[in-house]
Amino acid sequence: MALKLNPVTTFPSTRSLNNFSSRSPRTFLMAASTFSSTSTKEAEAKEVTWTTKRGAYASDPFHAPTGSWEIFKSLGRLGLRDVLISHLKPVEKCWQPQDFLPEPESDGFEEQVKELRARAKELPDDYFVVLVGDMITEEALPTYQTMLNTLDGVRDETGASLTPWAIWTRAWTAEENRHGDLLNKYLYLSGRVDMRQIEKTIQYLIGSGMDPKTENNPYLGFIYTSFQERATFISHGNTARLAKDHGDMKLAQICGIIAADEKRHETAYTKIVEKLFEIDPDGTVLALADMMRKKISMPAHLMYDGEDDNLFDNYSSVAQRIGDTAKDYADILEFLVGRWKVDAFTGLSGEGNKAQDFVCGLPARIRKLEERAAGRAKQTSKSVPFSWIFSRELVL
């Protein structure tokens, strides 16, 4: 799952975590929680302080509404099972990376590789930095499956559970796994990038994990994945368009087929949240507002190559400059608010009405902030080296 969005100011929230700005695995997280002889539930409710070399913050768990576990169990048993399964494809009907790559068993393999490399020579360095960043983000798939399995009421309890939620998570992971495989092999064959530096970055990223601030809460978790899959669909679609603009129709096809997968997955996750709004509009709008106040953290925000502590920000800046990133954070939020018809709900609690007003008014507030940030960025452009392209420099 890739996501490259403009930085957004965090709006205050009594439930939000203080901003965690670590970008590098040089920053180690240490859980300093005190567990006594209290029950498991009491221990889980205790405040946990995470200490880093750049500061500390305390977690204040946002609890899902009472009965949410039962809601998710019933969703899995009832109609949502068919909804989830309908957005998966049988393995035998899925494309595989080899469908788009030179055939190693063929006598024409070397010629096919030469043709791929000839097309790749026409692509600029900044495009390859974006493509590499997308691939690295996709390759951190173990982290994303782990995150889904932290969510209460939907996690895979055995590793091979036959609940609808567990089946979905494993099948989603299996489909996503092809994305990193395909882009990795393409980049290897292109000869345009430093594969060892890329491989180091992948290892660092998986080892660092991620903190999406979903706090084991399935409401927050599926709002987060809806946002991320929408961003990923847009990103890969733009990468396909840019490849086409540079004349590489094969690479455009590769990025386009990945984008199509992401669109299916986006649809599935947004339907889950849509169903939550139908069953529990108050709890869901409160969760949406909470997630937006904390802001959506990027899956690869701890990206590091052993050299650049600001690698993710620099990669994101290049993506924004060449037009690969989603236009802004506000576009995705506005799309989801419309998709879920958040402004149409009535009969909410007082807190629910406040959350509804906050979420519906947020895109306009974000755009104003982003316009100011874009103006400042134009005045402070600089060049930085990227190890992925043999330390050649690019303008941010």
Curated annotation (Swiss-Prot):
Pathway: Lipid metabolism; fatty acid metabolism. This is Stearoyl-[acyl-carrier-protein] 9-desaturase, chloroplastic. Belongs to the fatty acid desaturase type 2 family. It catalyses: octadecanoyl-[ACP] + 2 reduced [2Fe-2S]-[ferredoxin] + O2 + 2 H(+) = (9Z)-octadecenoyl-[ACP] + 2 oxidized [2Fe-2S]-[ferredoxin] + 2 H2O. GO terms for molecular function: metal ion binding; stearoyl-[ACP] desaturase activity. GO terms for cellular component: chloroplast stroma. InterPro entries: FADS-2_CS (IPR005803), Fatty_acid_desaturase-2 (IPR005067), Ferritin-like_SF (IPR009078), RNR-like (IPR012348). It is found in: Plastid, Chloroplast; Plastid. Fe cation 1 binds at E138, E176, H179, E262. Converts stearoyl-ACP to oleoyl-ACP by introduction of a cis double bond between carbons 9 and 10 of the acyl chain. Binds 2 Fe(2+) ions per subunit. The lineage of its organism: Eukaryota, Viridiplantae, Streptophyta, Embryophyta, Tracheophyta. GO terms for biological process: fatty acid biosynthetic process. Gene3D superfamilies: Ribonucleotide Reductase, subunit A (1.10.620.20). The keyword Membrane does not apply.
